[in-house]
């Protein structure tokens, strides 16, 4: 991961948000490969630990794209529901890995899954998740919604609403939402603030349609930012002006 110069921050961060839902793409956990990159997971865990120590409550949803992507497996002839369940299992592997590295950072962490896996995780119980957060624990939601055809973006939006998070922090491998694809258009400009409605009107991509509709209909802000810059999770929680903030 690229390191930013954060040595100049003299005081600990002061969180703007009390409770956040952090959405992490599974592809980043693999470092661009199939499987897990321990260095990436460790770096993410350090960033989350910094935020928790500042007093913020953090819940996490992780994708499983570094292991399986149901839609892609379907294109190769696999039955969609079965391939989606395989993807859900991938999210659990990522969740357990992040839990391990957070525990090594001294952060008490619970994994809750939408599919019962009693030996490795708690079942998803919203009130229990909130109680864990109030006690300063990180809660990682694994196995997506537990239903095929629903993405982990949708899971992030739904879980954020149900646990009373103030914002969905959508961590990406880019700096935010641009006017065009910056990989193909060097003149593409970063959009720092935009409304939910304008995102739709301009055809911009923030999250999948179901997830975005949930956030728009319920007034849930989304902050899209670059996870690959060290310290950005803390900056996002502190309300520093990074990435793209989508509000009603």
Swiss-Prot record:
Regulation: Inhibited by UTP.
UniProt keywords, alphabetically: ATP-binding, Cytoplasm, Kinase, Nucleotide-binding, Pyrimidine biosynthesis, Transferase
Binding site for UMP: 64, 84, 145-152
Domain of life where this protein originates: Bacteria
Signal peptide: none
Entry keyword Transferase: yes
Stretches assigned to coiled coil: none
Molecular functions (GO terms): ATP binding; UMP kinase activity
Pathways involved: Pyrimidine metabolism; CTP biosynthesis via de novo pathway; UDP from UMP (UMPK route): step 1/1
UniProt xrefs under Gene3D superfamilies: Acetylglutamate kinase-like
Chief site of localization: cytoplasm
Subcellular location: Cytoplasm
Any one Pfam family match given in the protein's UniProt record, by short name: AA_kinase
Biological process per Gene Ontology, one example term: UDP biosynthetic process
Cellular component aspect of the GO annotation: cytoplasm
Enzyme Commission number, as recorded: 2.7.4.22
HAMAP family referenced in this protein's UniProt entry, alphabetically: PyrH_B (MF_01220_B)
UniProt subunit comment: Homohexamer.
PANTHER family xref list: URIDYLATE KINASE (PTHR42833), URIDYLATE KINASE PUMPKIN, CHLOROPLASTIC (PTHR42833:SF4)
Family of this protein: Belongs to the UMP kinase family.
Role summary: Catalyzes the reversible phosphorylation of UMP to UDP.
NCBIfam families the UniProt entry points to: pyrH_bact
Protein name: Uridylate kinase
Organism: Mycolicibacterium smegmatis (strain ATCC 700084 / mc(2)155)
The gene coding this protein: pyrH
């Amino acid at each position: 991961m690229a390191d930013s110069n954060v040595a100049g921050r003299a005081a600990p961060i002061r969180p703007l948000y009390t409770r956040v839902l952090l959405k992490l793409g599974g592809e980043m956990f693999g470092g661009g490969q199939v499987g897990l990159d321990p260095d990436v997971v460790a770096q993410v865990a350090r960033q989350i630990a910094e935020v928790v120590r500042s007093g913020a409550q953090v819940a996490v949803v992780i994708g499983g794209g570094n292991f399986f992507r149901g839609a892609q497996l379907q294109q190769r002839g696999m039955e969609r529901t079965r391939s989606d369940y395989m993807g859900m299992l991938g999210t659990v592997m990522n969740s357990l890995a992040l839990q391990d590295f957070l525990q090594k950072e001294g952060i008490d962490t619970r994994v809750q899954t939408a599919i019962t896996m009693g030996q490795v995780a708690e079942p998803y119980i919203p009130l229990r998740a909130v109680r864990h957060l109030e006690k300063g624990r990180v809660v990682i939601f694994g196995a997506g919604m537990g239903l095929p055809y629903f993405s982990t973006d949708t899971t992030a939006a739904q879980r954020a609403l149900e646990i009373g998070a103030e914002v969905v922090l959508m961590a990406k491998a880019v700096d935010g939402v641009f006017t065009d694809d910056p990989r193909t258009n060097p003149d593409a400009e970063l959009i720092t603030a935009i409304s939910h409605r304008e995102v739709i009107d301009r055809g911009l991509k923030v999250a999948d349609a179901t997830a975005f509709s949930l956030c728009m209909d319920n007034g849930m802000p989304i902050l899209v930012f670059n996870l690959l810059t060290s310290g950005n999770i803390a900056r996002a929680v502190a309300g520093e002006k990074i990435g793209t903030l989508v509000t009603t």
